[in-house]
Amino acid sequence: MLLLALLAFLLVSRTIARPSYSMVDDTTPEPEEPPAKYQISKADVFPVLPGEPLDLRCPLADGPLVTWTKDGAKLEVNNRTLIVRTYLQIKESTTRDSGLYACSVLKNSHFFHVNVTEASSSGDDEDDNDGSEDFTNDNNNIRAPYWTNTEKMEKKLHAVSAANTVKLRCPAREPHPSNEWLKNGKEFKQEHRIGGYKVRNQHWSLIMESVVPSDKGIYTCIVENEHGSINHTYHLDVIERSSHRPILQAGLPANTTAVVGGDAEFVCKVYSDAQPHIRWVRYIEKNGSRFGVDGLPYFKVLKAAGVNVTDEEIEVLYVRNVSFEDAGEYTCIAGNSIGISQHSAWLTVHPAPVNPLEDNPVPYYMEIGIYSTGIFIIFCMVVVCVVCRMRQGAKKKKNFTGPPVHKLTKRIPLHRQVTVSADSSSSMNSTTPLVRITTRLLNSTDAMPLANVSEYELPHDPMWEFSRDKLTLGKPLGEGCFGQVVMAEALGIDKERPKESVTVAVKMLKDNATEKDLADLVSEMEMMKMIGKHKNIINLLGACTQGGTLYVIVEYAAKGNLRQYLRARRPLEMEYSFDVTRVPDEQMTFKDLVSCTYQIARGMEYLASQKCIHRDLAARNVLVTENNVMKIADFGLARDVNNIDYYKKTSNGRLPVKWMAPEALFDRVYTHQSDVWSFGVLMWEIFTLGGSPYPGIPVEELFKLLKEGHRMDKPANCTNELYMMMRDCWHAIPSHRPTFKQLVEDLDRILTLTTNEEYLDLSAPLEQYSPSFPDSSCSASSSSGDDSVFSPDPMPHDPCLPKFQHVNGVVKT
């Protein structure tokens, strides 16, 4: 009895000591909750934006066991949640991640109240609950959808700057409606824009983050149910700006799984107006911690941009021969002068599948027997072949008593040109390979008694040799007197994609080519090998040198040369054909022309760094790829050209006098600075959309004008700053001309400050452009006849000679 009384006393005292938690009505007690629920007032409050990472660091002392919980449930590590002792990170947080988080060490706990809320970006989100509240309707009151807040839908035109977040809303109600968005009258899918978009059905909203000019358009919201349909339209205009950090494509890099010994690949697509710096890093641990004393994480740089690394190469990270130590997080970081962006992905490594033969290995004595038998069989076959050849040789000596046949074999040794000048920029110090064809006389008594035969032996280079069986030749792209270029498909020429076919261009000789033509083609191939690869030059992909005709495989440019490319995009107002049926290609903006100039300058800067002098830089020798990338071509050619429209015939061959610097024209001295002069003429071609330099001027008159200091006028669609850059390139003293490095820096600055909205001025005088119809009235003024380097460019009812400005400012016609 005494024990029962003591037990009753303890129960009563515990009930009295327990605090009471109730709602407003004190007669209805609340069920008891875990103690952690009553410490929310002491928790740290963490507001987080959706999509941003959630980082929590436990202030408690680091003990042997740290436990993280959310709303009382223990958190586990997964592809979004990372737990490293007292550090918790949740990537790309969502509203479902809101709640009460706690870290516990022994008997101590610390709480975090996390609230993931949507940021107000467009100024109209005062009430995000429009149309999202619960309601009940009788079956008799069911009707078609209707708008609940038309005031917030009155603003139909939204004009925002690039890289901002846009939120379009159409709040509606009625039971079971469906919400659909269209862009320009077509279904709007996630893959239609970089980074995708978000649709919040409970708030009737469409959210697009980091908008770009391609997001411009008409967006239609359609709300419907079985009783009817309503729609509302917004017009979105995105104003491009260059001041934003790099944009990384959503979903890249993606999580990857690999087996031990295999390979893994991560891809990171970066979009940036300013030149971005990209690198791949992997976060590591030191002394059991991922963070240093300064709070910054430890990391190891796996891959970074360099001089010889193209943008396509840096955007892909390959992990070869994967091991368990390679498992973990890999991060792509892209930065520019505005800011830094980064995306991460995880590599999961699984053990390699077990080979069933390893469970039952073949005894070593059986292997020895197999190898011995094979070696014996091979030895017997070799002996039989040798005996047969000896018998056949003896028979031929008995049956044939005629004179021996001499076989001429021509070999092509390659030598590097020796430096003979102290000036490192002169043409006498270039690294052009010298190709000589030597003849070797062989005696052969086994051949039939035919006439002498000439053969060519090209040195085998395994690094560049490509199998002819994997090359499929296509249609011709162009040809000269002794050579031609054809389109082809090369299977597996890209070592990163060995099973895919790539469209390439193949250079080859015609049947009537001479030994000098062969030597020139070999010299060009060797020059491209030495120079290496760059984004803005035509790169060598491979060569077929053995077992047939010499094939030199280079990159293919789908849009032809730059001169044709610019002329095809001239507005109709600039043409003289007055062909109303002709539809020009897309109109080019001022920024497009500056971009072309900048890319060519980058390519020439790289060639100059490799001590390569082009000698024939012009728009016709710049090719344009499918993605509008400028690539300099023919930088390894021997300069013995044959083009009557652009070259003056002299005793020394044919020279591109329109583009040549005075020291090259009169003294035959070629340097990097003479290439800078040609670059200035190329700039003039670009800003006249493919115009002919010095139109209608005879050769003899041009020589006189250049010596007197005359220069071409400023093109109509060219700023004063760019024209002064041309004039600097045309300075009479070579050392006073800018270097390509300086030109790249100036053009990069101009390109950064230029917007896409600056279209060409169509009201400018047309005398800067060459007409599209054949020469007529001015042809008689050219005293050079068919050998003239100029195609006279007559203007309707205008004089044939344009104005030229003297260096002292005097204008002469």
Swiss-Prot record:
Q: How does it sit in the membrane?
A: Single-pass type I membrane protein
Residues binding ATP: L477, G478, E479, G480, C481, F482, G483, Q484, V485, K507, E555, Y556, A557, N561
> Where is it chiefly localized?
membrane
UniProt modification remark:
Autophosphorylated. Binding of FGF family members together with heparan sulfate proteoglycan or heparin promotes receptor dimerization and autophosphorylation on tyrosine residues. Autophosphorylation occurs in trans between the two FGFR molecules present in the dimer.
Which reaction(s) does the protein catalyse, per the Swiss-Prot or TrEMBL entry?
A: L-tyrosyl-[protein] + ATP = O-phospho-L-tyrosyl-[protein] + ADP + H(+)
Q: Domain Ig-like C2-type: where?
A: 21-117, 145-237, 246-348
Q: Where is this region: Disordered?
A: 119-143, 771-801
The record ties this protein, via Gene3D superfamilies, to: Immunoglobulins (2.60.40.10), Phosphorylase Kinase, domain 1 (3.30.200.20), Transferase(Phosphotransferase) domain 1 (1.10.510.10)
Q: Where is the Protein kinase domain?
A: 471-760
Q: Where is the composition biased (Acidic residues)?
A: 123-136
Q: Where in the cell is it found?
A: Cell membrane; Golgi apparatus; Cytoplasmic vesicle
Q: Where is this region: Heparin-binding?
A: 152-169
Where exactly are the transmembrane stretches of this chain?
Answer: 368-388
InterPro entries named in the record = FGF_rcpt_fam, Ig-like_dom, Ig-like_dom_sf, Ig-like_fold, Ig_I-set, Ig_sub, Ig_sub2, Kinase-like_dom_sf
Question: Which ranges sit in the Extracellular compartment?
Answer: 18-367
Gene Ontology terms, MF aspect: ATP binding; fibroblast growth factor binding; fibroblast growth factor receptor activity
**S-S bonds:** C58-C103, C170-C221, C268-C332
What's an example GO cellular component term for this entry?
receptor complex
Q: Which UniProt keywords apply?
A: Apoptosis, ATP-binding, Cell membrane, Cytoplasmic vesicle, Disulfide bond, Glycoprotein, Golgi apparatus, Immunoglobulin domain, Kinase, Membrane, Nucleotide-binding, Phosphoprotein, Receptor, Repeat, Signal, Transferase, Transmembrane, Transmembrane helix, Tyrosine-protein kinase, Ubl conjugation
Q: Which residues lie on this side of the membrane: Cytoplasmic?
A: 389-813
Out of the domains of life, which is the source? Eukaryota
Q: Which family does it belong to?
A: Belongs to the protein kinase superfamily. Tyr protein kinase family. Fibroblast growth factor receptor subfamily.
| Its job | Tyrosine-protein kinase that acts as a cell-surface receptor for fibroblast growth factors and plays an essential role in the regulation of cell proliferation, differentiation, migration and apoptosis, and in the regulation of embryonic development. Required for normal embryonic patterning, limb bud development, lung morphogenesis, osteogenesis and skin development. Plays an essential role in the regulation of osteoblast differentiation, proliferation and apoptosis, and is required for normal skeleton development.
For domains, the record's comment is: The second and third Ig-like domains directly interact with fibroblast growth factors (FGF) and heparan sulfate proteoglycans.
Q: What protein does this entry describe?
A: Fibroblast growth factor receptor 2
The protein's organism comes out as Xenopus laevis (African clawed frog)
| Gene field | fgfr2
